[in-house]
Amino acid sequence: MSSPPPYLTVRLIGGTNMFEEFYCLKHTPFSRDIPTEHLYRSSMLEEILGRLEYAARRQLFAVVTGDCGTGKTTTIRSFKNSLNNSRYMVMYLADSKLTPRHFYKGLLEQLGCEAKFYRGDAKRQLHREIELMQGIHHLQPVVILDEAHLLDKEMLEEVRFLLNFRMDSKSPMALILVVLMPI
């Protein structure tokens, strides 16, 4: 068996961080897991974070839109990290095939609860948990649905019904949908 041609050979010299060492960098640039405190805080990012914080404070519905790769999810990470943990409970779901049952299950699990099996029971359970969270713990729930452009009609209807609380007189949570702009 012959050895591969030399142009297919990869040699790592100096370990996996040779790039950082060569350019005297503290961190790998443009990595997906960049800490949000290291993000460049442009005026546009500050405005988006301000609007999202307003939506969280007022328990509103918000939609974050943008093209693929423009930093929607990174912005959401920055937003989540900017919120006061003693005032807000952030729940995040990203599932292209999210069903209403799995939606409630995912949120209730993030609250430390085992979800009821039936969708209606799980919805009522979530409303009770939110009332306890707000009344006893004084936490405002913030639900973030990433990749929401992939949700089907049934799931979008369920989200709409979830926000109808106390005969539509109160929003039980801030809801933020993160969607890809149509191509």
Each language-model region and where it sits:
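Conserved NTP-binding/hydrolysis module of P-loop NTPases
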Residues: 28, 88-90, 98-117
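Walker A/P-loop
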Residues: 74-88
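Residues at the beta-strand->loop junction immediately N-terminal to the Walker
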Residues: 65, 94, 145
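Residues immediately C-terminal
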Residues: 70, 147-153, 161, 182-183
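A short, basic N-terminal segment
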Residues: 2-58
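Walker A/P-loop nucleotide-binding motif
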Residues: 58-78
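Mid-core helix/loop region of P-loop NTP-binding domains shared across ATPases and GTPases
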Residues: 20, 99-102, 114-158, 166-171
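Canonical AAA+ ATPase core
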Residues: 167-183
